[in-house]
Swiss-Prot record:
Chain ranges of the S4 RNA-binding domain: 38-99
UniProt entry tagged with the keyword rRNA-binding: yes
Xref: CDD domains: KOW_RPS4, S4
Superkingdom per UniProt: Archaea
Protein name (Swiss-Prot/TrEMBL): Small ribosomal subunit protein eS4
Protein family: Belongs to the eukaryotic ribosomal protein eS4 family.
Recorded name of the encoding gene: rps4e
């Protein structure tokens, strides 16, 4: 089994120099898809530049200095993805897409570093007549709240993962675009177009653009808005 990838073949979502080294780390199977995740080794060495060598980055992790979503992680090939919160030496960062579609780190404020937006990707009935929700980062949660639908975003507290807010996928709400030609942009939903064929459902925005529904991540409603981080960007 190959556990590393040539740097020239690393997905473009990972923003690293392509010719500095021959090999690039491959994320272990985890919550995020491999082509939409970045290893902690890459985060420490190439994004934040807290180390020059893999051995130094591994030592930082082994000392328990890195948290992901409020929990210590020591595996250097652990993959982090969209909306994950990384804490290193008291500084917090959130993983987001830039307008080229690459995953980058943005400095996050202390009051928002304990919040995790999670988009519902699937919803099934669980034993006990409860609802099981599957989220964009691979997490699964059981709840009794039947009002949550696929496409909605819940705001969970970290690290206990308790739902504090629900943002519906509906016209009038704000959204962040996670793919396509408008990746990294935000806009206000004007209309959701449901296709009766096998074509992808479309979402239209007040700003004049349209994208497929799978690329829309709602972040705000009249009741509550999750403010995207606007601090320093790495790398």
């Amino acid at each position: 089994m190959i556990n590393k990838t040539k740097r020239l073949m690393v997905p473009r979502t990972v923003k690293i120099p392509r010719k500095t080294y021959f090999w690039g780390p491959t994320p272990l199977p985890g919550r995020h898809k491999a082509d939409h995740s970045v290893t902690l080794l890459t985060i420490i060495r190439d994004y934040l530049r807290l180390s020059d060598k893999e051995r130094e980055a591994t030592r930082i992790l082994a000392n328990g200095l890195v948290k992901v979503d409020g929990k210590v992680v020591k595996e250097r090939k652990f993959g982090v993805g969209f909306m994950d919160v990384i804490e290193i030496s008291g500084e917090s960062y959130r993983v987001v897409y830039n307008n080229q579609g690459a995953l980058v780190l943005v400095s996050e404020s202390k009051d928002r570093a304990n919040m995790k937006p999670l988009q519902v990707k699937n919803k099934v009935i669980a034993p006990g007549n409860k609802i099981q929700l599957g989220f964009h980062d691979g997490r699964v949660m059981v709840t009794e709240d039947r009002s949550i639908s696929v496409g909605d975003v819940v705001i969970a507290s970290l690290p206990d993962m308790k739902i504090t807010e629900i943002i519906k996928m509906q016209p009038g709400n704000k959204a962040f675009i996670t793919g396509g030609s408008h990746v990294g942009e935000t806009g206000t939903i004007s209309k959701i177009e449901i296709k009766e064929s096998s074509s992808a459902n479309l979402v239209h925005f007040d700003e004049g653009f349209t994208t497929v529904k799978d690329h829309v991540f709602v972040i705000g409603s009249p009741r509550f808005t999750f403010t995207m981080p606007s601090g320093e960007v790495y790398p």
